[in-house]
């Protein structure tokens, strides 16, 4: 099933650009379009000065278009936001830098603050007074207008009631703020019945354990609540059932997530439990559980932990603290998926270095060095660290597997959608040396996610995010190897909820470093700039295509657009236009020449024509170019122009050599099966256009690492081109088993791109190989209709 967002091109404003000329060309990739009958072009005689003059005029026209053309739709707000992008980037940088020493940027929990407020003064000599009067003050300052406490931006009845009950109990315990206490109590009385209608998919963590304990405290204080309400009877029953399932010995034997809700339990052996404190002094990073333990034990480290928390949060405390690992990893993930991570390379590297130091062989926790690890944070760390070149073993997932099933936390009562989603994403970054565990993890997570999608149940127990179902569907429909950066970003711009997303702990909370409106504004402005530039480049490319009469060689306008899209979807940075356009023009011209050579292959004359083209390209034989073969002549002129546009000096010779090698792959026997050679031509062109190849060409020729990258890319793309042809009506010979073979080679390619310790080849050049291979994977994976939907979405549909 394709995602709804990937609509057919015919429904979008630029549909005329995307309509196929005929059914058959739709079934071909930009690599292997079959030729239509060739219409002989007229004689095209240009000298180099004319070509350069034409290009100068083209560029002037581009400049005129850019200044004259308003943003698509004439949206002044969009224009304003794009002009403000540098300021937004600086603001985000400042926020990321300010958080570098933070233990987590999260909102305060009224519930946890209430438990802190309940702590009696430890050195009071028997006199009752609050140990943390700042917590009382925070409660008094943060009551909502309707009398409740909780998340002001989203109403979930469990969140509002447990926060409100906790605050009312705290105020009543110390006999302060009577008016606010009365308003809170009235809110509880008016809304208690709603518990019977609450959605259990979004239950607050440990609610059935902790809410009854607060009710008991309220009853002892004589607060007027209907303790026999039917909704409460159900919660009491769930509490008894859950407590009966918790072996007392297991609770005290090792650190588990049960430590997070200790305030809801009784008859505890504190001497044994205090062994499981986190390095920061807390019990499982829970202020509420730590406050309860402090009341019972007077432990100095618990006291210091709570003092640190309320000092950092102006008298309050979050529901979980610290969350430094989670905060850093998820913010990096969001910036990457929003397509703006390139602006924050140093900040991201610092965050990932921090995460790497906190990753243990058993995995990672959400905060500090908490002994209880979880698969969610482990998966995010594994994926991001591997993609940034860190040496991370796949054995970190072994801790979360039992009898072929995977869990987020040991002893969990239900599976988390987002934990399996993030684990599925991580399981696709596989190296050849990894054991079968990652493949097993991928299969398990995919089966789980597919089952949830089939039943329409794509909500999660830890986050409320409207875009989550779409995120999961995209991950299932487009594996990492076939997901292009600009496609993923364009879709994610509509999935990312920014500040509207809420996380679920013992109450709702927000992660301001993860879900940030400024991220979204900056990403939209950045993408709008990309679209503006892409539309101008597309107009220029179309003029080039028409001027060189490439339509006469069977190249349709649609295939030109697809070639540009594949280049722009991978290489999208504004300062890399030469690489992007070099890729696109090379793909288009390769298709035109391939179409011409196929005409000769039909009568066994491809070898001779190939030799003549190579001779004309290498020798600048202008007499030969004026021969009667006008089709070949026009292609040589176009090729000459391409080289002049994208290469200078020695780089020009390198680009001619790249084309020569590509032409040499054409023989009567090959019948145009040159997908691997075309991939290498694209890689070489991109590197030459970037200026990287010329400066390192000699060393690369002697590099075994570079040679192996070429071998892998050529092999993979040759297989994928064969698959594309078979899907589109070509021969089915040698197609069986291609996917498995490509997957094996992809493992080695991923390792050579992200896990190599060799310095022979730059990381950017390695990424070029991967970009080109992924573009082949994308074409092989997607239907023509899906590709055209992506073209419309990425290039022509404005970001709202």
From Swiss-Prot:
The transit peptide is at 1-47
- Provide one Gene Ontology biological process annotation: defense response
Motif DXDD motif location, chain numbering: 374-377
Which annotated residues bind Mg(2+)? 374, 376
Q: Which cysteines are joined by disulfide bonds?
A: none
Q: What class of enzyme is it?
A: isomerase
Induction note: By UV irradiation.
Give me the residues that bind substrate, please: 242, 461
The free-text domain remark for this protein reads:
The Asp-Xaa-Asp-Asp (DXDD) motif is important for the catalytic activity, presumably through binding to Mg(2+).
Family membership noted in the UniProt record: Belongs to the terpene synthase family.
Protein name, as recorded: Ent-copalyl diphosphate synthase 2, chloroplastic
The organism is Oryza sativa subsp. japonica
């Amino acid at each position: 099933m394709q995602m709804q967002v990937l609509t057919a091109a015919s429904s979008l404003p630029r549909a005329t650009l995307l309509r196929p000329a005929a059914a058959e060309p739709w079934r071909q990739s930009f690599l292997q379009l079959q030729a239509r009958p060739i219409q002989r072009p007229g004689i095209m005689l240009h000298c180099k000065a004319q070509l350069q003059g034409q290009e100068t005029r083209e560029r002037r026209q581009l400049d005129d278009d850019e200044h004259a053309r308003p943003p698509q739709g004439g949206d002044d707000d969009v224009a304003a936001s794009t002009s403000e992008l540098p300021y937004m980037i600086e603001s985000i940088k400042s926020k990321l830098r300010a958080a570098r020493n933070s233990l987590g940027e999260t909102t305060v929990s009224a519930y946890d603050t209430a438990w802190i407020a309940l702590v009696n003064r430890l050195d009071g000599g028997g006199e009752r007074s609050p140990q943390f009067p700042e917590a009382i003050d925070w409660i008094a300052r943060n009551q909502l207008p309707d009398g409740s406490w909780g998340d002001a931006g989203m109403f979930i009845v469990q969140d509002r009631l447990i926060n409100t009950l906790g605050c009312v109990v705290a105020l009543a315990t110390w006999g302060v703020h009577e008016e606010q206490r009365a308003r809170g109590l009235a809110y509880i009385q008016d809304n208690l019945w709603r518990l019977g209608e609450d959605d259990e998919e979004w239950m607050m963590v440990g609610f059935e354990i902790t809410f009854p304990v607060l009710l008991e405290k309220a009853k002892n204080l004589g607060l007027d609540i209907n303790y026999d309400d039917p909704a409460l009877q159900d919660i009491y029953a769930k509490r008894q059932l859950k407590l009966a399932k918790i072996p007392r010995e297991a609770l005290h034997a090792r650190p588990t997530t049960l430590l997070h809700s200790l305030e809801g339990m009784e008859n505890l052996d504190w001497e044994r439990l205090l062994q499981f404190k986190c390095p920061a002094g807390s019990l499982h990073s829970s202020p509420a559980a730590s406050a309860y333990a402090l009341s019972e034990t007077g432990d100095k480290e618990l006291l210091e932990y709570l003092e640190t928390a309320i000092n950092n949060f102006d008298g309050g405390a979050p529901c979980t603290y610290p969350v430094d690992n989670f905060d850093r990893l998820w913010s990096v993930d969001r910036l990457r998926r929003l397509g703006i991570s390139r602006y924050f390379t140093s900040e991201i590297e610092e965050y990932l270095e921090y995460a790497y130091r906190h990753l243990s062989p058993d995995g990672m926790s959400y905060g500090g060095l908490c002994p209880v690890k979880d698969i969610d944070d482990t998966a995010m760390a594994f994926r991001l660290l591997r993609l940034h070149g860190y040496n991370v073993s796949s054995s970190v997932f072994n801790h979360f597997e039992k009898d072929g099933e995977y869990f987020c936390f040991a002893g969990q009562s239900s599976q988390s959608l987002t934990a399996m989603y993030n684990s599925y994403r991580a399981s696709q970054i596989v190296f050849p040396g990894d054991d079968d565990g990652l493949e097993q993890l991928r299969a398990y997570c995919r089966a789980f996610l597919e089952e949830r999608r089939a039943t329409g149940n794509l909500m999660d127990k830890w986050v409320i995010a409207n875009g989550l179902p779409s995120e999961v569907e995209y991950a299932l429909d487009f594996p990492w190897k076939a997901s292009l950066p600009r496609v993923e970003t364009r879709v994610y711009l509509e999935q990312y909820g920014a500040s509207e997303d809420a996380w679920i702990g013992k109450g709702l909370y927000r992660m301001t470093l993860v879900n940030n409106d400024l991220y979204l504004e900056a990403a939209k402005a950045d993408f709008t700039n990309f679209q503006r530039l892409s539309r101008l480049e597309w107009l220029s490319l179309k003029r080039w295509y028409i001027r060189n009469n490439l339509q006469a060689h069977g190249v349709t306008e649609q295939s030109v657009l697809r070639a540009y899209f594949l280049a722009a979807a991978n290489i999208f940075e504004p300062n890399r236009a030469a690489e992007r356009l070099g890729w696109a023009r090379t793909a288009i011209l390769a298709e035109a020449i391939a179409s011409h050579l196929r005409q000769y292959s039909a009568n066994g004359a491809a070898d001779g024509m190939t030799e003549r083209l190579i001779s004309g390209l290498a020798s600048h034989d202008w007499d030969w170019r004026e021969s009667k073969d006008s089709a070949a002549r026009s292609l040589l002129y176009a090729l000459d122009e391409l080289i002049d546009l994208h290469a200078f000096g020695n780089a020009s010779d390198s680009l001619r050599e790249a084309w020569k090698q590509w032409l040499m792959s054409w023989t009567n026997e090959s019948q145009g099966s040159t997908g691997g050679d075309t991939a290498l031509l694209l890689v070489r062109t991109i590197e030459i256009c970037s200026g990287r190849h010329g400066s390192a060409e000699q060393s690369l020729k002697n590099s075994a690492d570079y040679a192996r990258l070429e071998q892998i890319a050529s092999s993979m793309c040759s297989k994928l081109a064969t698959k594309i042809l078979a899907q589109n009506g070509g021969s089915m010979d040698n197609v069986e088993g291609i996917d498995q073979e490509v997957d094996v080679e992809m493992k080695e390619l991923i390792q050579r791109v992200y896990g190599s310790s060799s310095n022979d080849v730059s990381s950017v050049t390695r990424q070029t190989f991967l970009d080109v291979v992924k573009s082949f994977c994308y074409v092989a994976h997607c239907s023509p209709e899906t590709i055209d939907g992506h073209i419309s979405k990425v290039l022509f549909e404005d970001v709202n």
